[in-house]
UniProtKB/Swiss-Prot annotation:
Subunit structure: Monomer. Interacts with DAB2IP (via C2 domain); the interaction stimulates GSK3B kinase activation. Interacts (via C2 domain) with PPP2CA. Interacts with CABYR, MMP2, MUC1, NIN and PRUNE1. Interacts with AXIN1; the interaction mediates hyperphosphorylation of CTNNB1 leading to its ubiquitination and destruction. Interacts with and phosphorylates SNAI1. Interacts with DNM1L (via a C-terminal domain). Interacts with ARRB2. Interacts with DISC1. Found in a complex composed of MACF1, APC, AXIN1, CTNNB1 and GSK3B. Interacts with SGK3. Interacts with the CLOCK-BMAL1 heterodimer.
Residues covered by the Protein kinase domain: 56-340
Keywords linked to the UniProt accession: ADP-ribosylation, ATP-binding, Biological rhythms, Carbohydrate metabolism, Cell membrane, Cytoplasm, Developmental protein, Differentiation, Glycogen metabolism, Kinase, Lipoprotein, Membrane, Neurogenesis, Nucleotide-binding, Nucleus, Palmitate, Phosphoprotein, Serine/threonine-protein kinase, Signal transduction inhibitor, Transferase, Wnt signaling pathway
Activity regulation field: Activated by phosphorylation at Tyr-216. In response to insulin, inhibited by phosphorylation at Ser-9 by PKB/AKT1 and RPS6KA3; phosphorylation at this site causes a conformational change, preventing access of substrates to the active site. Inhibited by IL22 treatment which also triggers phosphorylation at Ser-9, promoting inactivation. Inhibited by lithium.
An annotated GO cellular component: nucleoplasm
GO MF terms, alphabetically ordered: ATP binding; beta-catenin binding; dynein complex binding; kinase activity; p53 binding; protein kinase activity; protein kinase binding; protein serine kinase activity
Organism ancestry: Eukaryota, Metazoa, Chordata, Craniata, Vertebrata
Name this polypeptide is given: Glycogen synthase kinase-3 beta
Keyword Transferase attributed: yes
Amino acid sequence: MSGRPRTTSFAESCKPVQQPSAFGSMKVSRDKDGSKVTTVVATPGQGPDRPQEVSYTDTKVIGNGSFGVVYQAKLCDSGELVAIKKVLQDKRFKNRELQIMRKLDHCNIVRLRYFFYSSGEKKDEVYLNLVLDYVPETVYRVARHYSRAKQTLPVIYVKLYMYQLFRSLAYIHSFGICHRDIKPQNLLLDPDTAVLKLCDFGSAKQLVRGEPNVSYICSRYYRAPELIFGATDYTSSIDVWSAGCVLAELLLGQPIFPGDSGVDQLVEIIKVLGTPTREQIREMNPNYTEFKFPQIKAHPWTKVFRPRTPPEAIALCSRLLEYTPTARLTPLEACAHSFFDELRDPNVKLPNGRDTPALFNFTTQELSSNPPLATILIPPHARIQAAASPPANATAASDTNAGDRGQTNNAASASASNST
């Protein structure tokens, strides 16, 4: 979690809203096996507001925190597992997480299937329940497994996980949405298919230039230096810094900047990047330009990592963990980095022999920040496949574990027509 209590009341430009209109009763019954079945009136996550009855069973708690509780459940109609995130709804405000999740539709972002409201134990207490894709693992748990075994995560997995993370960031940033809590715990994984899905949009916000934002955001080890400096006019490049911290952690087997406080965090960053120049400090937060820092030289990146770390991985890390926010790569530029060239090889497979997940089904929306990058991001074999088959919706749920055959979308088709 980001270290601050989270309800659905926000100080950052949230507008009052009336009582939820889709508030419905929760009915409990038993199926033929005697299992408890809960039926609610829920609204689909995407599309028009058409509430419908949804029944689920086999409910159990799988997570909790300051945000609320997460349950696992099984949908009765399909037998699919889902995660239900239950958060306290402040009736004075719209729930920003819900508003954002209803906009998103991408193969590397956890999907909002339904949402519904339920009453709490106290009078007038209302909870918002988000019914999400259930994904069994996290990057955090997988990385911890390797670390405890005194092993490093195989580089092919580092490439797959980071590439998909950057795709998800390119997508949300194209809408002006900043996640603000990128960390290994919020990166869900299917261990069989290697599909990664970004989750937990409880801290996410659509950033508007000129509007202030809270600086106490993001979990400590992954906080960009401008946040530590108290900046309130930051950009979505704080997500890129966090992603750089995740990449470094996967390569090292431990967090790269493990500070116990904000000041300690800054010390850890300075140990690696050296003391920021006055100009770099001005770029992060102009109010700090007169602050005196001890003069420390940057540590060579090659000495930060193990000797066998791929040079391309180190080069990518150095382009993400930059003091100056505008000097950091964009997520789309990161996807095009040479570190990920192996993923663009038509013969690449997962270590278990399976095809890689969908990697090249870019939408025009995803490519909007830099359309010319499509020539790098969509390799020739994917362009040929796109030209030979009708384009499909890049964000269809079935894309997530079916490879890229026949699934590259209009952006790929356009690229194919221009370059084949």
